[in-house]
């Protein structure tokens, strides 16, 4: 194998500048940069992924008459009330963690100080999703989880645009 060719391949692999001499010995040269640093740009808030989920959520809301169906079945099904209560508990704990603990009290790692808050929030949110699936199953059948997941992702991506 050719030594200059191997050095060139190594330089390209690790993005060394061509001026840097590659030595076989492990001598540290603090004044010489060892790799070219890439300038990282922050990701844009509105990208193809978030735009797709927001658009899909709008399309699902329009074509399946989501709010009309929700309004008609709200009082006739107790799964909505139970799911709504669980969703309220989940969002209350989440706002407590984000607004009160992180912003007001300044505890950035609240999951370390209060380790049970995140699993309780996750469990209540999943239980609320199951309740909403049971409540709307008689309307959309096996499409219900897909429609609710699309709505959920649209809301999450819309919230990510805000901040």
Curated annotation (Swiss-Prot):
Keyword Cell membrane: no
Entry keyword Phosphoprotein: no
One GO CC term on file: membrane
Disulfide bridge map: none
InterPro entries: TMEM128
Subcellular location, record wording: Membrane
Protein keywords: Membrane, Transmembrane, Transmembrane helix
Chief localisation class: membrane
Superkingdom of the source species: Eukaryota
Pfam families, per database record: TMEM128 (PF20479)
Segments crossing the lipid bilayer: 47-67, 79-99, 117-137, 142-162
PANTHER family in the record: TRANSMEMBRANE PROTEIN 128
Protein name in UniProt: Transmembrane protein 128
Lineage summary: Eukaryota, Metazoa, Chordata, Craniata, Vertebrata
């Amino acid at each position: 194998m050719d030594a200059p060719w191997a050095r060139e391949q190594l330089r390209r692999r690790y993005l060394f500048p061509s001026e840097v001499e590659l030595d076989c010995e492990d001598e540290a040269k603090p004044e010489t940069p060892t790799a070219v640093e890439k300038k990282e740009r922050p990701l844009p808030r509105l990208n193809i992924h978030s735009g797709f989920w927001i658009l899909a959520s709008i399309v699902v809301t329009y074509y399946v008459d989501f709010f009309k169906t929700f309004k008609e079945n709200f009082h006739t099904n107790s799964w909505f009330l139970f799911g709504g209560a669980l969703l309220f508990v989940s969002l209350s704990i989440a706002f407590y963690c984000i607004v009160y603990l992180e912003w007001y009290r300044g505890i950035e790692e609240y999951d370390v100080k209060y380790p049970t808050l995140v699993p309780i929030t996750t469990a209540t949110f999943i239980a609320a999703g199951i309740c909403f699936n049971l409540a709307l199953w008689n309307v959309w059948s096996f499409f219900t989880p897909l429609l609710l997941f699309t709505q959920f992702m649209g809301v999450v991506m819309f919230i990510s645009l805000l901040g």
